[in-house]
Amino acid sequence: MEENMNFITLTEPAARQIKILKSNFDNEVCLRIGVKQGGCSGMSYSMNFESVSSLRETDEVLMLDSFLVACDPKSLLYLYGLSLDYSSELIGGGFQFSNPNASQTCGCGKSFSG
């Protein structure tokens, strides 16, 4: 498990929402951020909580106030420098990704092409 403090940045609203969501879990969990095939533009973002014991040696890990953010090496190629924000607006709310590596994004903001 390697540490890289710059692979992703979180705004204060995003960090606050992640802490709220994390509080729903009893065990020690981290937030895994990655990419998967699919979505309007070819790739889509994935975010889920998983047990800290599931972290792999090859994962990049970012330690924040009270939680870990993990990313696998293949996803990191597409996500390095990602900024994650959160909005509670009824229309267009939720987590919002700002990815400097995306050559094209779709209107929903949840998928991109590299």
UniProtKB/Swiss-Prot annotation:
Gene: ycf83
Keyword Plastid: yes
Swiss-Prot/TrEMBL GO biological process terms: iron-sulfur cluster assembly
Protein's cellular compartments: Plastid, Chloroplast
Keywords of this entry: Chloroplast, Iron, Metal-binding, Plastid
Record: residues binding Fe cation: C40, C106, C108
InterPro entries reported in the protein's UniProt record: FeS_biogenesis, FeS_cluster_insertion, FeS_cluster_insertion_CS, HesB-like_dom_sf, ISCA_plant_cyanobact
PROSITE patterns: HESB
Protein name: Uncharacterized protein ycf83
GO MF annotation: an example: iron-sulfur cluster binding
A Gene Ontology term for the protein's cellular component: chloroplast stroma
Species whose genome carries this gene: Porphyra purpurea (Red seaweed)
Family membership noted in the UniProt record: Belongs to the HesB/IscA family. Ycf83 subfamily.
Key word Iron present: yes
